[in-house]
């Protein structure tokens, strides 16, 4: 039993260092993209879609920037990097919220999008597959993309369904 415990502990540390190196690489890529202006251009590309998903958020409000950055980080499979951006986005959305005790429409939509987790490049899963010597660590990309696209579409549809249901009842 002791041998298994120490072997598992060693493997956990090795796996964590492997995942950290992948995270550091992608965070570095995000910084390069930020300094080169690529993030700003991508943000402009996504803003029309994001503005439609969050119509109550003014286009130049800081919340919009955090929302777009969070979605982009999640899309690249950088969940750990997306978390602080998501927290900042929620803080900004709370400032915009007139009723502080209840989540706003934008807060609910943002939560639904984050929960669905649209991912183009599942970096963490690829890293784990590399660690365990997978013959093709990237073969997970296609199924992950399909599953997360379906989940994101479902999240948006369900979010809109309940929003319009509340509007018809006069709750919002």
Predicted regions mapped to residue ranges:
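Membrane-embedded alpha-helical segments and adjacent helix-loop junctions characteristic
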Residues: 2-92
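Alpha-helical transmembrane segments and their lipid-water interface positions
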Residues: 17-22, 121-123, 155-159
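Hydrophobic alpha-helical transmembrane segments
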Residues: 67, 111, 141-145
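Mid-bilayer segments of alpha-helical transmembrane spans in multi-pass integral membrane proteins
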Residues: 71, 75-80, 114-123, 148, ...
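Hydrophobic transmembrane alpha-helices that form the pore/transport pathway of multi-pass ion
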Residues: 71-113, 128-134
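Membrane-embedded transport cores of multi-pass solute transporters
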Residues: 120-140
């Amino acid at each position: 039993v002791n041998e298994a415990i120490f072997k598992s502990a060693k493997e956990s540390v090795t796996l964590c260092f492997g995942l950290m190196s992948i995270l550091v690489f992608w965070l570095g890529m995000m910084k390069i993209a930020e300094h080169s202006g690529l993030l700003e251009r991508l943000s402009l590309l996504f803003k029309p879609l994001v503005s439609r998903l969050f119509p109550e958020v003014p286009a130049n409000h800081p919340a919009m920037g955090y929302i777009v950055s969070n979605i982009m980080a999640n899309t690249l499979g950088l969940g750990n990097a997306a978390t602080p951006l998501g927290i900042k986005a929620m803080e900004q959305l709370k400032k915009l919220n007139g009723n502080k005790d209840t989540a706003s429409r934008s807060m609910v939509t943002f939560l639904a999008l984050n929960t669905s987790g649209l991912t183009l490049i599942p970096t963490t899963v690829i890293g784990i597959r590399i660690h365990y010597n997978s013959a093709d660590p990237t073969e997970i990309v296609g199924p992950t993309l399909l599953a997360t696209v379906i989940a994101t579409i479902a999240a948006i549809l369900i979010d809109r369904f309940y929003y319009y249901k509340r509007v018809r009842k006069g709750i919002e």
